Amino acid sequence: MHAQRAELEYGLSGSAEPEANDIFRIDFDDPRIDWRLAEGDTEIAPGVTAVLTAGHTPGHQSFVVSRAGGGGFVFAFDAADLSENIEREVSVGTRIGASAEQCAEQIRKLKRIAAQRGYRLVPGHDPVVWPALTAELTVTRGLVKPP
């Protein structure tokens, strides 16, 4: 499991705060998990880079995925839930240990990465973007739709 060290430490902290934020020790304290910890941006596999975007959680990470045939995506995940977060550079609603401005800076970071590489920045939970992206990739890349 690839994670930022700050995320694991927060999840294992034993304080009441993580559970108050719906982060449960049981999800982290499992001897079967082979933790691969990072402290900042790091390539975790060829063409896949974890990008530290702390704010939503202390060790939140987004991902840059470069496709073998060219192009790629920057997946914001919970750093930017909706297109509106990206367009307006507005923080997500839930933040742990970060200000709205710090979270907005993470969105700007992802926008810079996407612009520098010419990649599409994909929000984490946008109900319009994800179905459209799935449909586009199904048609253009020959992906098979699930039954």
What is each residue range found by the language model?
Residues A6, P58, P127:
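Flexible loop residues that form catalytic
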Residues H2-L52, A100-G118:
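Metallo-beta-lactamase
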